[in-house]
Amino acid sequence: MQSANDLKQLLFSINHKSYPAYKSTRGAYQFPRYTLSIDHVQGDPFAAPSRVSVHISGKTAAFPSFLYDTYEKRVALQDYLLRQFARTIAPYSFRAKGSGKSGLLGISRCGQEILERTACVLNPSDGSLVVNMEIGFPANGRTIASQELIRILFDFLPGCVEKSLFYRALDQKACANVARLCEDQQAIRAALKEKGLTAFIADGSILPRETGVFDLPMKHAVPFTSPESLRVTLDLPNRGPVSGMGIPLGVTLIVGGGFHGKSTLLQALERGVYNHIAGDGREYVITDASAGKLRSEDSRSIRNVDISLFIHDLPGKSDTTSFSTADASGSTSQAANVIEGIESGTSLFLIDEDTSATNFMVRDELMQRVVADSEEPITPFISRVRDLYEKLGISSILVAGSSGSYFHVADTVIQMKEYVPYDITDRAKTTAAEFPPFTASVRPFSVPAFHRCPQPGKGLTGSDRTKVKVMGQESILINKSLTDLRAVEQLTDSEQLNGLAALLLEAAEHKMDGKKTLVQVVDLLEKQMDEKGLASLLAPGRPSDLARPRRQEIFACLNRCRELRF
C-alpha cells in the first residue's frame, strides 16, 4: 500500500495537467490513523463527484462492543457516527475553490429515522469502520488544481476524521445514550408481541411535524396523552417504566372531526415501523415492524394477482384469480395492495379513508337497494376486515371521518379531539346498535395462493450498460423502465430508493429464473443483506449511497416494476 506522502507527491506531479490525470490517484493510501481509498474519480469537475472512503481498524476506532453487539445497536451507532461526520465536514465543503463541483465534501444526509446505510459501515466481527463520502476534485476549467485537493485531503479531512470517527474523541456518554435508546426501542417492539399490541405511543410524544416538507417536531404541539382505559406501562431496560397508549390487536377505528389529529396519529404509526433519533418526539412511538400502509393507486400496474377476495365477476369475464392490468382503478389497485401486503407477510394494515377508494371500503344501504349485490363485482373491505384478523391474524387500524359503518366491526374506537385521544369504544358500540350493521352477500373467505414466479424483461437486463436514475422518493428509472413508487408512503429517504434500485437489479441479474416465487426471491435478497451486508449490492452501474428498505417496500417495488414478467 502506498503512503500518504506518495499521494501528496503524485498530486504535486499532476498539478495543472488535464483533468483525466486525476485517474492516476485511484488506490489506497496509508495515513497515520486510517487508510484513505480513492475509489472512483469523476470524469470532469462538472460530473458527479469522486468517491472516497475512509477505513479505520477496530483497534484504532476503539468502539466498545456493547455499543454494537446487536444488529439494531450497530445500525444506531453507524447512524450516529454518520451524523457526527456530516456535521464536522459541512463547514469545509466548497472551501477549496475551483470550477463546477470543485471542493464539494458530501455524505449521506440522515433524516429522523435510523436506517442502515452504506455510507457508514461498522464490521461487527472486529469493530473496523468504513465511511464512504464524495469529494469534488478541484480544477480550474478542466485543468487540475491539485493544490486545492491537497488542502482537502491533508488539511481538512484528517481533522474531521479525528473529531468524529474515533471513540476517544467523541462524547462517550452520547454514544452510550444511542445504544440505550435503541435497547429501549427494541424492548418496546418485543413487548408488543408479549402484550398483544399492534402499536405503542408513549405519553409525552410529539406527533405533529413542523410542515409537510420538514419532518422535525412541531413547536408548541400538544404532547400525546393516553386515555386511561388504553394506558399500558412498559418497564424498559434503561429508561425504566414508560406509560402510553397501547393499541390492541384486532380492528381499531380512529375517528374525530376534521383537523383534530386523526391522520397525524396514523402518520406517526406509519413511521413507527422505524426507530427514531433522540429529540424527534417519536422515539417511543413503536408500531409492528411489518405494518403496511394501504391506499388506492390509480394507474398502477398489476400482474397476475389473485384479487378475487375483493373483486369478481368483472364485465368481460376477466379472471380476477390472476388479474392483470397496466392501468388499475382505485378499487382494483387497493385490492391488489391488500393481497400483495398479505404476500409480504404484514401483520397490520394502516388505512386512511382520505386516500382510499370509497367503493372499495364500504357500500351503504341505499346503494345496495339501488344496485343489487349480484350486480356489484366489489366485495368491500368492511366485509373482509374481520376475516383478515380472525383467520390470518392481520390487524387493521383505520381512520374514518365520514362513514360510521366500521363501528360495527371495530374492536377499539379512538376519537381524536383537539389532538387528544379518547377511548369511545363503548359509546360507539352502543350508538351503532341503534343502526343496522352493514350486511352483504359475500363469497366465502379463502386465502389466495402465492405462486407467482417473476422473470426480468429486457428493459432490465438487455443492455450492456445499465443506466439508473432515482428521482427523490418518487420513482426509479432503470434504462427506460420507470417504477413509480409515489404511493408507497412508508419510504422515508431517497437512499431507500437507491437501495430498491440495487435490489431490483440484483434480483433481475442473479435471483430471478422464472422458477422461484416472488416470496423466495425476496427471501434471497434479505438473506444476502443479512449475511453479506447492504454493501454487497454496490456495483458499477448501480447507485452508490444505499439505505436498506423494509421487506414490505421490496415487495412493493417488485410488484410495481413493469419490466418484470409474472
Residue ranges and their predicted role:
Residues 341-385, 389-390, 399-429:
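Conserved P-loop NTPase nucleotide-binding/switch module
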Residues 242-274:
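Glycine-rich phosphate-binding P-loop
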Residues 1-196, 207, 558, 566:
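N-terminal accessory targeting/assembly segments
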Residues 145, 310, 314-331, 363-378:
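Flexible beta-alpha connector loops of hexameric P-loop NTPases
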Residues 193-199, 203, 259, 266-297, ...:
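Carboxylate/His-rich catalytic cores and anion/metal-binding grooves
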Residues 390-393, 399-566:
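Conserved NTP phosphate-binding and transfer environment spanning the P-loop NTPase/kinase superfamily
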Residues 329-330, 334-341:
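Conserved alpha-helical scaffold flanking the Walker A/P-loop in AAA+ ATPase domains
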Residues 208-243, 278, 286-302, 307-318:
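N-terminal pre-Walker A segment at the start of P-loop NTPase domains
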